[in-house]
Amino acid sequence: MNTNTKKLVMAALMAALTCVATMMIAIPSPLKGYINLGDCLVLTSGWLLSPVYGFLAAGLGSALADLFAGYILYAPATFLIKGLMALIACFGFRLFHKKCSNLISRIISGATAEIVMILGYFVFEGFMYGFIPSAVNIPANGVQGIAGMIIGIVLMKTIEKSKITRLC
């Protein structure tokens, strides 16, 4: 199969899986968002795909979940925030992988991406609802970020053992 076709198919698959994982378990948070498992696939998109395909898969999959779940106002911000998370995961892994093990590289890049998610939604919700009320969602986003990072790292271990080639 053509390499570009393989990358496109993998990105589409990751976008679909991200959308499903985001919607499958959705626990409403205090403001208008929700806690979900989509971050594990957002990070996996960054670690597995190229920067552009990772950004698009993570951003589109997450934004589609917001649209389908009725969080229409969140969709544009989600597209940017989750896309940036995948970019940070990809570039962070590439940078630290030269000096550290896969596990440490994924922890550093994943934690950095999750901090961007927490800050991104804090700023977005701050403009929508005020910065004091938006601070209420920081702990929920932190829990989601930690869970997403742990599950994403375990998922990547499984992918590496199955000998699926890295496309990044």
What are the language-model segments listed below?
Residues 1-168:
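Loop-helix junctions at membrane interfaces
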